[in-house]
Amino acid sequence: GIYFYPSLMFSLVASICAFFTYKKSKLFCISIVLFNCILIFLHGNKGPIFSIFIAFILYLSYIENKKIKFMFLVKSFAVIAVIVTAFFAYTFTDGNPIENMANYSDYTRNAVLVASSNFDFMYGKLLMESEVYSRIPRAIWPDKPEDFGALYLAKVFFPDAFYRNQGAPAFGYGELYADFGLFTPVWLVISGVFKGVLAKYFSNKTQETKSAHYFIMFLFCIGISVIPVSMGWLFPEHLMIAFMVYIASSFVFSEHIRFVLLRNNK
């Protein structure tokens, strides 16, 4: 809730900013990242661990200009896979751990459920609601609908869970299909090109400035979010986070520490 997601977000941001100390102090960088990884595990969330690892690989490539060997990636992913599997076995005491991991593919089954139904296409209504309604606090709009965006699909396909106020299960591409129907590939191409242009822009700025705020935006544009929620395209929120990281760097008086957030190109 109000503490869970911000805590994960700050752990991710702290880990990414810690990467920028890697060249000066590997011990400090690794200590900060490991500490935040432990915090993330204590939240019961595994996805951000992969995000931190991939972000670090991208940091080495885009900031430190190092070549990443293929076998290093294979070994690293194997270690992380073993750790995550062990975490599943430890936290899920009921049933088979493999079956519990397989249940994470529910979004695929839900997408097929939507695609194989006679659901009337919404032509962008669900997307608009997810992007707009989700950002309006209920304190400001007391009559805000309960069934907007993916929640409307939950109401249609999983009414029992919806009326028990259990939220919306992940529908994957099913949510887009419910919106655009046969035009879904067209939307994916258009949105993909737009996001690709943004990713290229922030990639260039990251390599040019070697700074954390541009790096955070680059990560978001290629699919690595520091805000662990699934609803909506959180571009404005990531801009705000990147801006706060930039502002924080301007209040650091020591040039020895300042490179952590905003490197000097001298």
Where do the language-model regions lie?
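Hydrophobic alpha-helical segments
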Residues: L12-V13, F19-T21, A168-K266
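Short aromatic-rich membrane-water interface segments that cap or initiate transmembrane helices
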Residues: G1-Y5, S116, L176-A178
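Aromatic-rich transmembrane-lumenal/periplasmic boundary elements in polytopic membrane proteins
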Residues: F70-F148
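Membrane-embedded catalytic interface detector for glycan/lipid assembly enzymes
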Residues: G1-K67, I80-D94
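Long extracytoplasmic/lumenal interhelical loops at the membrane interface
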Residues: L127, V132-F183
